């Protein structure tokens, strides 16, 4: 016969007060955690004790039997006493305590089987009536004969004794020590208390908080299914003890990113979602608990707040006040790493001292100053500055100088200012280069004379600035390259603003001069709200040539006229007498400029060009212009390597101008002609009517159209 193990203290008290005072050899109280263990639900009375109670021969002595019963009862008392302190509902008993309690056991008298069964039946009924927290298990409420009880006890005695001994050994080795308490004070706790009893220990880690429910899942689930088959009114441990309720997770704005506050029966703790680590203290405070496992420390080092080697618990977060400081450093790294050379001040002294030594930098608000380092200059040709090629040529110069200047502090021989720290100032329509220490003016370049400027387009060249201008002494086109402390687009934007201002001032001055010569009485008031369209810049092509001069010719057209003029000039002059110049071809104007002085040698309107051709020599080119009534002039050029590009450009300009004239003439003919008088309209209508009548009658009279036209 198996003995029930789910009887509580209330059942035993009711049994002791409701009947005669009995001295029970077996304490029948069982803790709630024994109901969740599959191995303990079939705990049986030792076969030797049953044989002695039934009076069978060959049984053991009364003393050892009573000691066995008392030992089992005290073990159950210890398990019940420590149930509210064990988080995983494990039986808490050690071998040392078991050995220490054995000498204190007092021998009790043997009991008969019938008397023992009556006590068990009465206790089971009382436990069911009082509605215990765990479902009471009644073995049988029917009467059973002595023979049936003897057969069942004899068949199960040996197996139950072996299971009981193995179970006690496993529980003693795996459970923490617990102290027994009096029987009257043992009660099933209303809710399992995992981490709230007593002060919190720092040795609790994430495995304790997150692994409670999975530590004994198989045994717990199977045992509960067996115990609750007959009592559906009670809930399961999952229902009565919910660690994860909907309100358990809280997010707070005070917590750093990635942290969450969790509240459950164990208390309030903080969970770092990316790494999976937990801690009792808020993450924004001094340091984590001392119980952080080595695995948790290795996960914390992944965030990059410290080096990869090991740290002590007290030293790991010592130098890090918060999680925001490393983020600020991470934002600064891409900005400092954009340059290929080390980030350093462009002057030997720190920048604050340099600013103190340079008071004029910020005194005049009209001066824009930029700290730069000269990389030198590269000579350029006029062909490289042609439209569509200038940006590529300037970028090649930047690439050529910046890639070969690995050490910027080593000055190179060649041009002025090479490898030096300079101040680039934009003042009064002038670009100035000033020595930082002595404020000495090294170079001044009028902004209006700068041909091209640009910023490096390659990756890492955003701080390289270059401009192209003609040298005053050598008349050579030079591309000066600088490396700026700030992004070079600031200089380019400032230059663009200054050029726009200069062009606006010149436009206003030209309008003022023209306005003085106009009759103000004929001017029409224009409202100020009207927005005039911005003028479009025409495409200008420049070609470097030798200007042979111009001669008057008799006819405006003819290849023989051009060939005769070219032969006469080539035979009468030498190459040294030819003037180096360049021709600017625009859709409206052809301009001939001196290559060195940029003086205008000739300017011709495309609308007055009458004929153009290439001479017998492919290097020669000439065109004829109308200089006045019955006066024509032939301009001649020597081109390298041939005159094909120049002739095509002039021809394209002529065709474009001719097309514009046609467009303007067609619009004027449709919209600008005055309306015909009424008399002319009447004559035209009458003529149309007469013509219709004549066509009907088949008249073949000739029509005089000129007489009837207005």
UniProtKB/Swiss-Prot annotation:
**All copies of domain PID, residue ranges:** 370-509, 542-699
Per UniProt, what does mutating residue 701 to R do?
Abolished acetylation by KAT5, leading to decreased transcription activator activity
Effect of changing residue 270 to F: reported as:
No effect on phosphorylation by ABL1
Q: Which residues form the signal peptide?
A: none
Q: What are the annotated GO cellular component locations? A: cytoplasm; endoplasmic reticulum; growth cone; lamellipodium; nuclear speck; nucleoplasm; nucleus; plasma membrane
Regions of biased composition (Polar residues) lie at: 1-15, 223-234
Q: Which residues form a coiled coil?
A: none
Q: Which GO terms describe its biological process?
A: apoptotic process; axonogenesis; chromatin organization; DNA damage response; negative regulation of cell cycle G1/S phase transition; negative regulation of transcription by RNA polymerase II; positive regulation of apoptotic process; positive regulation of DNA-templated transcription
Q: Please note every region of biased composition (Acidic residues).
A: 145-173
Listed GO molecular functions?
A: amyloid-beta binding; chromatin binding; histone binding; low-density lipoprotein particle receptor binding; molecular adaptor activity; proline-rich region binding; transcription coactivator activity; ubiquitin protein ligase binding
Tissue expression notes: Highly expressed in brain; strongly reduced in post-mortem elderly subjects with Alzheimer disease.
What keywords are assigned to this protein?
Acetylation, Activator, Apoptosis, Cell membrane, Cell projection, Chromatin regulator, Cytoplasm, DNA damage, Membrane, Nucleus, Phosphoprotein, Repeat, Repressor, Transcription, Transcription regulation, Ubl conjugation
User: What sequence ranges are listed for the domain WW?
Assistant: 253-285
PANTHER family listed in its UniProt record: AMYLOID BETA A4 PRECURSOR PROTEIN-BINDING FAMILY B, AMYLOID BETA PRECURSOR PROTEIN BINDING FAMILY B MEMBER 1
Q: What does this protein do?
A: Transcription coregulator that can have both coactivator and corepressor functions. Adapter protein that forms a transcriptionally active complex with the gamma-secretase-derived amyloid precursor protein (APP) intracellular domain. Plays a central role in the response to DNA damage by translocating to the nucleus and inducing apoptosis. May act by specifically recognizing and binding histone H2AX phosphorylated on 'Tyr-142' (H2AXY142ph) at double-strand breaks (DSBs), recruiting other pro-apoptosis factors such as MAPK8/JNK1.
Please give the name of this protein: Amyloid beta precursor protein binding family B member 1
* Gene name per UniProt: APBB1
């Amino acid at each position: 016969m198996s003995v029930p193990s789910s009887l509580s203290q209330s059942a035993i008290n009711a049994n002791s007060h409701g009947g005669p005072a009995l001295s029970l050899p077996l304490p029948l109280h069982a803790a709630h955690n024994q109901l969740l263990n599959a191995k303990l639900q079939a705990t049986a009375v030792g076969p030797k004790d049953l044989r002695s109670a039934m009076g069978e021969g060959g049984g053991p002595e009364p003393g050892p039997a009573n000691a066995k019963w008392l030992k089992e009862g005290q073990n159950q008392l210890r398990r019940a006493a420590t149930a509210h302190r064990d988080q995983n509902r494990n039986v808490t008993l050690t071998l040392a305590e078991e050995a220490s309690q054995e000498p204190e056991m007092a021998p009790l008298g043997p009991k008969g089987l019938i008397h023992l069964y009556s006590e068990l039946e009465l206790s089971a009924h009382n436990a069911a009536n009082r509605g215990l927290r765990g479902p009471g298990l009644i073995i049988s409420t029917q009467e059973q004969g002595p023979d049936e009880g003897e057969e069942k006890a004899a068949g199960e005695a040996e197996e139950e004794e072996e299971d009981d001994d193995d179970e006690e050994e496993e529980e003693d080795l795996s459970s923490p020590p617990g102290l027994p308490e009096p029987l009257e004070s043992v009660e099933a706790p209303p809710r399992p208390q995992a981490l709230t009893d007593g002060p919190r220990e720092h040795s609790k880690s994430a495995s304790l908080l997150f692994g409670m429910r999975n530590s004994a899942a198989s045994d717990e689930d199977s045992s509960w299914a067996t115990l609750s088959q007959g009592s559906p009114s009670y809930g399961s441990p999952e229902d009565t003890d919910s660690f994860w309720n909907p309100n358990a997770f809280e997010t707070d704005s005070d917590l750093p990113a990635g942290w969450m506050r969790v509240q459950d029966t164990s208390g309030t703790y903080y969970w770092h979602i990316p790494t999976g680590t937990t801690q009792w203290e808020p993450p924004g405070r001094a340091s984590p608990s001392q119980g952080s496992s080595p695995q948790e420390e290795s996960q914390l080092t992944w965030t990059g707040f410290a080096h990869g080697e090991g740290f002590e618990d007290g030293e790991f977060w010592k130098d890090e006040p918060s999680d925001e400081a490393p983020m600020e450093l991470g934002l600064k790294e891409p900005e400092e790493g954009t340059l290929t050379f080390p980030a350093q001040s462009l002057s030997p002294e720190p920048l604050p001292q340099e600013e103190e030594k340079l008071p004029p930098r910020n005194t005049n608000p009209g001066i824009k100053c930029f700290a730069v380092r000269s990389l030198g200059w590269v000579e350029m040709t006029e062909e490289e500055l042609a439209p569509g090629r200038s940006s590529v040529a300037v970028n090649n110069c930047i690439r050529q100088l910046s890639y070969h200047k690995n050490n910027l502090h080593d000055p190179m021989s060649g041009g002025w200012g090479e490898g030096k720290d300079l101040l680039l100032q934009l003042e009064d329509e002038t670009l100035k280069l000033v020595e930082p220490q002595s404020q000495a003016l090294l170079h001044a370049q009028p902004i209006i004379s700068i041909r091209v400027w640009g910023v490096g387009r390659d990756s890492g060249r955003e701080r390289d600035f270059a401009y192209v201008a003609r040298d005053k002494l050598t008349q050579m086109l030079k591309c000066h390259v600088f490396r700026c402390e700030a992004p070079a687009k600031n200089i380019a934007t400032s230059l663009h603003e200054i050029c726009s201002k200069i062009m606006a001032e010149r436009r206003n001055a030209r309008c003022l001069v023209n306005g003085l010569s106009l009759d103000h009485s004929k001017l029409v008031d224009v409202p100020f709200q009207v927005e005039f369209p911005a003028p479009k810049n025409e495409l200008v092509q420049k070609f470097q040539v030798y200007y042979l001069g111009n001669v008057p010719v008799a006819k405006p057209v003819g290849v023989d006229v051009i060939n005769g003029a070219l032969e006469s000039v080539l035979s009468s002059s030498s190459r040294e007498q030819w003037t180096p110049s360049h021709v600017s071809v625009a859709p409206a104007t052809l301009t001939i400029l001196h290559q060195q002085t940029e003086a205008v040698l000739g300017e011709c309107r495309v609308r007055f060009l009458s004929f153009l051709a290439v001479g017998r020599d492919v290097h020669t080119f000439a065109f004829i212009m109308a200089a006045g009534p019955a006066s024509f002039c032939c301009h001649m050029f020597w081109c390298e390597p041939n005159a094909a590009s120049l002739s095509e450009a002039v021809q394209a300009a002529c065709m474009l101008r001719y097309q514009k004239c046609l467009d303007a003439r067609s619009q004027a003919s449709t919209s600008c002609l005055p309306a015909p008088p009424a008399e002319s309209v009447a004559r035209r209508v009458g003529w149309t009517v007469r013509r219709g009548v004549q066509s009907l009658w088949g008249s073949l009279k000739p029509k005089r159209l000129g007489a009837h036209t207005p």
